[in-house]
Amino acid sequence: MTASYSPSISVPLVGLVFPAITMVLSFIYIERDEIV
């Protein structure tokens, strides 16, 4: 793997995976808060 392929992988990874993790964690936090 060369450095030229790095942006095409890291940009979608940060742009899609990070918001997805944030949404899941916030959803779990809200669900726990409602249950308790």
Curated annotation (Swiss-Prot):
Segments crossing the lipid bilayer: 9-29
Any single GO BP term: photosynthesis
Localization in the cell: Plastid, Chloroplast thylakoid membrane
Membrane topology term: Single-pass membrane protein
Main location: plastid
GO cellular component, one term: chloroplast thylakoid membrane
InterPro entries, per database record: PSI_PsaI, PSI_PsaI_sf
Record key words, sorted: Chloroplast, Membrane, Photosynthesis, Photosystem I, Plastid, Thylakoid, Transmembrane, Transmembrane helix
Family: Belongs to the PsaI family.
Function: May help in the organization of the PsaL subunit.
HAMAP family: PSI_PsaI
UniProt protein name: Photosystem I reaction center subunit VIII
Organism from which the protein derives: Huperzia lucidula
